[in-house]
């Protein structure tokens, strides 16, 4: 449930554990301020367990995997973000939403072969590039060498995302405008 703070266009998040007592008893909830408040380098999160037995089993697993708890600095930073970051988040969400609008409008008008999928949460947007009729390798090479863009390849997230590329829209609008112009020029050159 990590991207639940990054909801777009008035969407609401329903925590999985709130659906029923039976579901709550079998749900481990993970939350983090790292994506929402750009604190990813702190590598910090919070895990909520429904019962002590499940928590104990995970602590044993974490110990075997040599995964440590959050450090003192990351805990203070997360607390500060949640306590003092509301104004920043209130400005961030419409900005990212505006970036999504820009991408959708730009593609519809200039690159109709690429169909952006507006997410309900997070700042990552899938671009459906299947109309370009490229293999995964061709699509990767096209984005890197022709468009000069380093996006995430969809197929690495599962076979159903072959032909998709993942774009990070949490950046200045000028960066997106440049990226979209580069993408248009690359598609036009096909």
Enumerate the predicted regions with their spans.
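PLP-dependent enzyme catalytic core of the Aspartate aminotransferase-like
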Residues: 23, 142-151, 157-190
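Conserved glycine-rich beta-strand-loop-beta hairpin in the small C-terminal domain of fold type I
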Residues: 79, 94-104, 116-129
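Helix N-cap motif at beta-to-alpha junctions
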Residues: 51-52, 131-133, 172-174
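Conserved PLP phosphate-binding loop immediately N-terminal to the Schiff-base lysine helix
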Residues: 1-18
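A short linear hydrophobic-aromatic micro-motif
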Residues: 104, 113-116, 150-155
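A short beta-turn/loop motif at secondary-structure boundaries
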Residues: 7-9, 117-120, 157-161
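Conserved core segment of the aminotransferase class I/II
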Residues: 20-97, 104, 187
